[in-house]
Amino acid sequence: MGKYYLAVDIGASSGRHILGHLENGKIELEEIYRFENGMDHKDGKLLWNVDRLFGEILNGMKKCKEQGKIPVSMAIDTWAVDYVLLDEKDRILGDTYGYRDHRTDGMDAEVAKILPETELYAKTGIQKQIFNTIYQLMAEKQKEPELLQRAETLLMLPDYFGFRLTGNKLSEYTNGSTTQLVNPTTFQWDTDLIRKLGYPEDIFLLLQMPGTKVGQLLPEIQKEVGFNLEVVLCGSHDTASAVMAVPQTEGDGIYISSGTWSLMGIESLKPIINEEAAVANFTNEGGYDHRFRFLKNIMGLWMIQSVRHEYKDAYSFAQLCDMAEESKNFPSRVDVNDPSFLSPDNMVEAIKKYCQKTGQPVPESVGELASVVYRSLAQSYGETVSSLEKIAGRTYDGIHIIGGGSNAAYLNQLTADATGKTVYAGPGEATAIGNLLAQMIYAEELTDLKSARQCVRDSFEIKTFVPAK
């Protein structure tokens, strides 16, 4: 039996601890622990309970001990853009806001007063999203300036959890890149930009690459979980880890990291920053080994998850797909990236209102709603492919769908049909796998990214969906 590695993969709706090891050149996975996640509604704010999340991280580690499977290392990935501010005693200042909170409303205009959006894109190559850290910090500066003044350190959430485990503060690059405050040429914070915006530059720690050691567990953590290990940086932005696990050795093709969000793009050795990319709202996020994830953020399965929730989770996703197929001729489509779908009080009403506003038939049944969502998502993928190929100046043969959404066979087929390209679906646990790959390369069990991706290809089933003739 090979050495165990622990991936702690925390998404916006759930978290999981997955143990991985190599056996006969293949990666074996075992889910050890899973827990629910979600933003808390408190006094009209959407917040993360980081103490609860840290407790869940420890709970999963204890499960490893209970099962007698002690990992040699662990790494943590989460969603992007959210952070904590720490004071001089390393206590959290203020609330830990979630990216769907409305405090950033109007903050793009405030940032644009200091730096026009075209200049900001030229500097960072990052897609404008109202929840990006740059806008969250502007909200902080405008509404609670004393917190920024008192802050000693800014840590993105996975870095904060790493600090709680080891006592060492490190800032990881891939997640840092999503803040819209990083220079894509230097792979470090853009101090000129930070100064211009009036943010305190000394709170930003030097960015470190995936594959960097964070440290050993603190003595009190060792005592609580019953063992020691090394904490290592993976691509701590979950999409960076997921893209690492695309089972294509050259990394040369279109991918969709499909989950609550759909991140659709290509891997590039250089950032693609030009007017066309800016207008199409593509982003250049940091990836493993100094690569760039040139991609577009698409609303993803959030809409269907929300619709299901409105119906009290009475239907499984498989049932929703069947009902959508029964209503496949329902003609209405929505722009899945419309801001009205980001954080509505009621997703079903938001979809109906959009159809009404755009003069389309209003969906009434669950099947009609599901059909609108799935087909609109596939249509968005088709438009994104056209845009991507135009900007990249080339065509691509296939699309790799990774992550939880790769299990949605119905959507995979719609995607093949909408794009006219063969879809390769899997692995579903791409984020955890990418997290593990970074640790295995660090431990020299795998040599590099190319061999790691070949290992993914050899280890997991990939399903194929061909466009309908």
Where are these predicted regions, by residue range?
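N-terminal glycine/serine-rich phosphate-binding loop of ATP-dependent small-molecule kinases
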Residues: 1-94, 122, 222-231, 419-421, ...
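Active-site core segments that coordinate phosphate-bearing ligands/cofactors
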Residues: 6-7, 19, 112-124, 138-151, ...
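Short, basic and Ser/Thr-rich N-terminal targeting/leader segments
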Residues: 11-13, 72, 77-79, 133, ...
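Short acidic-aromatic active-site loops that bind/stabilize oxyanions
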Residues: 46-54, 126, 130, 207-211, ...
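Short beta-strand-loop/turn "lid" adjacent to the catalytic site in phosphate-handling enzymes
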Residues: 62, 66-99, 127-131, 162-183, ...
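Short glycine-rich phosphate-binding loop at a beta-alpha junction
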Residues: 70-78, 153, 206, 394-403
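Short alpha-helix plus adjacent loop in nuclease-associated cores
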Residues: 97, 101-114
